[in-house]
Amino acid sequence: PAYMALSHAKALAQRAADGKPDHFHYVQMPLNLAMTEGLTSSTQEVGGKMYPAVRAATLLGLRVMASGAIRQAKLGTLPSHVNKALGEDLTSDAQRALQFTRSAPGVGTALVGLKQPTHVSEALALCTQAPMAPSAVLGMFGKPKT
């Protein structure tokens, strides 16, 4: 498969812990407006059912750190319906992209690298906005694909 089986990794961590609590608590995966598979593609088996990676991680007790939150600044221009869904009061596509990733249900941290002080200020301004409701994020895509 083209993905890591999270349940297998968790089972290996539990086996290595030899009956004690394992130390596998976090997983990092790409998640952004261009790479939504972590929310939309059911690639992970947990308990005999298929789930998207972020949901599977949550079911396995893992915290998700989403990398590439603003897609290394290669956003392009977001379509108007995406802008509307993410919040028309946000001032840039970078803020909208970060809003999407930080609001994704099951994501604990959205990782982003910023070089310019103005970009840092722009990202920090997002802290004055509430994250999107989980249903609003998931509603952007419809039902997860299997």
Q: Residue spans of the language-model regions?
A:
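Beta/alpha (TIM)-barrel catalytic core signal, keyed to glycine-rich beta->alpha loops juxtaposed to Asp/Glu
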Residues: 1-146
